[in-house]
Amino acid sequence: MRTMMRRTAGLLLTFLLSLTVCSVAFADDGRAWVWLSSNDKYSKFYAPASVHVSKSVMPSGTTEALATEITAEIKTSFSYEGAEETIRNYKINHVIPNPAQLSYSVAQVRVVPQNRTLQYLGETFYDSAGKVLWSKGEGKEKEMNSQQFDEE
C-alpha cells in the first residue's frame, strides 16, 4: 500500500512538473494557459492558477500531505474538423449549427490520483469572441487509462 502511494505521488509530481515546463498561452480572459498536447483537431491546455488540492490525507510517518483529489481547469481549442466532431458527438448541432463558430471550451475537472479517475464537473463552449455558445453539466467519472475517457 505504501509503495502504491509513493508511486502515485511520484506520477502526480512528474505530471505536475511536466506541465510547468510547457509553453504558456494567454486566453482572452487573461489567464495563463499551459500547452499540454495538440493534434489536427484539438489543442489542450491547463491553467496552473486553477490547480487546487481539494482533498488530502496525511499518511502516518510522513510530514507531507498526500493529494487525494485535485481540481483544475482545462481548455480545448478546436480546428474546424475538431469542432465538427465535437458538435456531432455532443449532438448539439441544433445549438451550434456552424462548426466555424466553435472556437474553444473551458472545463472544470476533478482528478483522483489513487483511482486514476477524471471527472468533468462542467464544460462551457465559446466562440472566438468569448461568447458562451453552450454549457454542459457534470459528466461521469472515467478511468484515465481506458478508452472510456474518449467516449464522452
Describe the role of every protein-language-model region:
Residues 2-12:
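Bacterial N-terminal signal peptides that target proteins for export
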Residues 26-107, 111-152:
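N-terminal secretory-pathway/extracellular module detecting exported/lumenal segments
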Residues 11-20:
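Bacterial N-terminal signal peptides
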